[in-house]
């Protein structure tokens, strides 16, 4: 009986805590930023669900309006990162890399990322104990 109680308590303790979930969401978002900054597809693969998509808006210099800038799929994101690495098109060393976790539920989470290209709102889901990015909505460039 003592062993059964011990195992039940152990299972409850081993289950991820809200603080661990938040750290894992932050890590997925940092992998996202660093994957694009460094051209590291391994970090992007660790961050994304294969069905991920990213859509965004870029501020038109002439009109000041934010125009739709297109959609990026998982495959396109990996190709973009490869291109960054091949061309050594890395951002400046002081480029922003900020992650703010907005909310974490049992299986869903949201975060705000600030990077050189602008602001991203990210939706994640937890599957098999791992937090992965499902959707990204962004606008840029960031206001100075």
Segments predicted by a language model, with ranges:
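Surface-exposed, charged secondary-structure patches
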Residues: 53, 57-58, 66-117
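Bacterial Sec-dependent N-terminal signal peptides
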Residues: 1-23
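Beta-strand-connecting loop/turn residues
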Residues: 50, 106-107, 129-130
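Short beta-strand edge/turn micro-motifs at domain boundaries
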Residues: 110, 119-143
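Short, low-complexity N-terminal intrinsically disordered segments enriched in polar/charged residues
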Residues: 16-42, 46
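Short, solvent-exposed secondary-structure junction/capping segments
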Residues: 30-34, 48-62
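Ligand-binding grooves and catalytic loops that recognize ribose/phosphate and carbohydrate rings
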Residues: 23, 49, 69-70, 139-144
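Hydrophobic pocket/interface hotspot
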Residues: 32, 44, 52, 111, ...
């Amino acid at each position: 009986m003592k062993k059964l109680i011990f195992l039940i308590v152990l299972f409850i303790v081993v289950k991820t805590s809200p603080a661990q979930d938040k750290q894992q969401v932050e890590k997925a978002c940092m992998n996202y930023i660093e994957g694009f900054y460094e051209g590291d597809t391994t970090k992007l693969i660790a961050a994304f669900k294969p069905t991920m998509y990213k859509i965004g808006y870029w501020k038109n210099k002439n009109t000041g309006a934010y125009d739709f800038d297109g959609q990026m799929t998982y495959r396109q994101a990996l190709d973009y990162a490869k291109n960054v690495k091949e061309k050594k098109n890395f951002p400046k060393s002081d480029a922003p890399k900020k992650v703010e976790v907005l909310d974490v539920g049992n299986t869903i989470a949201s975060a705000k990322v600030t990077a050189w290209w602008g602001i991203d709102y990210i939706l994640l889901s937890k599957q098999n104990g791992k937090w992965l990015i499902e959707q990204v909505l962004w606008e840029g460039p960031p206001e100075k």
